[in-house]
């Protein structure tokens, strides 16, 4: 569900069906293969114009969205401001860069006083852009967080699968200051740095996406919503600790027999972390905070391993279980040990909360694959 091969494009006939749900990543006619949306669950197509313009409505919250392929005569900013003028709403520029522009707007839409966010992202492969508008009525402003998440669901390139979305990048930008971090991994002291705002920015994303996740507590698509929750944290976290990940890899890889040996050093490191919850509303500790000695739980530790491995170009994912209230790290490896299959791959699983265990060893009572949900990563 999260690889290019599994990314799907809706046919025009399917898009005309109001019952059609947009799940996982979806792409568009007229844009490159790496341009996609990873929308929150239970958005469906209310109306469409051909295969390039769609009005979306959400089944679990009073939020609507428009996704439209647009030509870019000049910059994303110009295309976005032109769209706002046509919509006849008031707006203020929240931020722009060479790839995208973002505005916050308010005005009357469909006869209701409304508020929302709009962005245009540029597809470098075709020169076209995607206009993405997400809004709710002012009386439903408490759901505006879902509109933010819709904006952040847009990926304009393969690199965006590993980076903060447009909203987080432009509204919560990096600082100009970096802070030193140190970690003892595999007997070696790793010295690196992270942006000074990495922790606070990451925690904002985590808290927001947890609000999104709570919308699906009683939804039949709760598992898919859970998967997206972790995917959104993954893509944001990959960027926050990318330099640290690469410093770890390049300082350790020459001493490791293979990728599994490297991954074992990460697993042993996370097993020694202090246990703590409630770092954020969701109880998920941000990865930057963990580098400063903050406590963590199983899912944050599993995510830490997955992020470092993915940043090191090593195939990994995580498995989560509502039944066991637990999470496991997972690594694509031909080493012996207990593994779970996801898609067409077998993943060696790792227990992050019991010191001394190696990859492929978990509690016997937790080996039922049916009780685990895979979170596949790019």
Residue ranges and their predicted role:
Residues 2-9:
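Bacterial N-terminal signal peptides that target proteins for export
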Residues 11-18:
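Bacterial N-terminal signal peptides
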Residues 24-49:
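N-terminal "mature-domain start" segment
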Residues 43, 134-171:
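Surface-exposed amphipathic alpha-helical segments
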Residues 45-136:
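Conserved polar/disulfide-associated segments of primarily extracytoplasmic proteins
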Residues 185-239:
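Secretory-pathway-linked proteins and extracytosolic
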Residues 226-293, 353:
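Secondary-structure boundary elements
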Residues 256, 288, 300-378:
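Hydrophobic/aromatic-rich core segments of domains that either
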